[in-house]
């Protein structure tokens, strides 16, 4: 059987930085989504994924909210850059669910965010998906966001939704995906609560729980964000983990190769 390969391009925490500018000078900077996207090499066995926190955090983000009044401009940008899947970050709720809906409603990419449901419901609003690549490889994709949104966000901005504990939500989705996926991938808008080399506790809160996700669940790939911390690809408890820095300073490229029963992820 011939090898089958999945390539993933991953960004996170762009915070509205689309162009190569920091808005502080006229000099071009080595940041921004367009800089990253110009290097994506996409084919039928490639997925382009974002880990959330796109809508808020830059003068452009403020202009789109204050002057245009909806998120369609950012949807158009993501469409142009060829995104396939996104999850939600805590700052994507900063302008309320109507604004968020105007972004998602015009987005070609699928949103996956398993722990976000309607206030009086239990089914996820943005459920996990199985994406079949051109080569036949089946990729099970789950998204989750830190439930600290409930602590930080203005109540009126999230009045119509419920954001639950990410781990039970991800675990339930993973259980459904395992038998129908060749590769399982989780997009987590959250970071690491422990040092990856030593296991030393960095934070005892529930804000960042990527280390625990790797301990308790068995995704093949965990794409993280939120901390604005560059984490090079490495394996933790059998799960391949990465995190890009913020504002499009870098993107992550992950390759998974399946050769019979063997998986190689780099």
Regions found by a protein language model. Name each.
Residues 1-266:
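Acidic, metal/ion-coordinating pockets
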């Amino acid at each position: 059987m011939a090898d089958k390969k999945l390539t993933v391009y991953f960004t996170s925490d762009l915070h509205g930085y689309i162009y190569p500018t920091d808005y502080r000078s006229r000099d071009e900077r080595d940041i921004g989504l367009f800089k990253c996207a110009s290097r994506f090499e996409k084919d039928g066995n490639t997925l382009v994924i974002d880990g959330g926190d796109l809508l808020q955090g830059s003068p452009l983000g403020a202009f789109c909210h204050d002057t245009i009044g909806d998120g369609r401009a950012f949807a158009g940008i993501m469409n142009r850059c060829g995104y396939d899947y996104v999850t939600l970050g805590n700052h994507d709720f900063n302008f309320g669910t109507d604004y968020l809906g105007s972004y998602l409603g015009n987005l070609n990419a699928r949103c996956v965010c398993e722990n976000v449901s309607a206030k009086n419901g239990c089914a996820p609003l943005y459920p996990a998906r199985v994406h079949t690549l051109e080569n036949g490889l089946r990729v099970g994709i789950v998204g989750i966001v830190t439930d600290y949104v409930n602590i930080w966000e203005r109540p009126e901005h999230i009045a119509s939704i419920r954001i639950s504990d990410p781990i039970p939500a991800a675990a339930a989705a993973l259980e459904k995906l395992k038998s129908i996926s060749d590769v399982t991938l989780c997009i987590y808008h959250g970071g690491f609560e422990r040092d990856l080399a030593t296991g030393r506790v960095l934070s005892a809160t529930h804000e960042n729980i990527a280390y625990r996700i790797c301990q308790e669940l068995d995704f093949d790939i965990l794409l993280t964000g939120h901390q604005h911390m560059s984490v090079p690809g490495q394996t933790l408890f059998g799960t391949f983990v990465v995190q890009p820095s913020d504002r499009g300073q870098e993107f992550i490229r992950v390759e998974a190769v399946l050769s019979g029963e063997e998986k190689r992820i780099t």
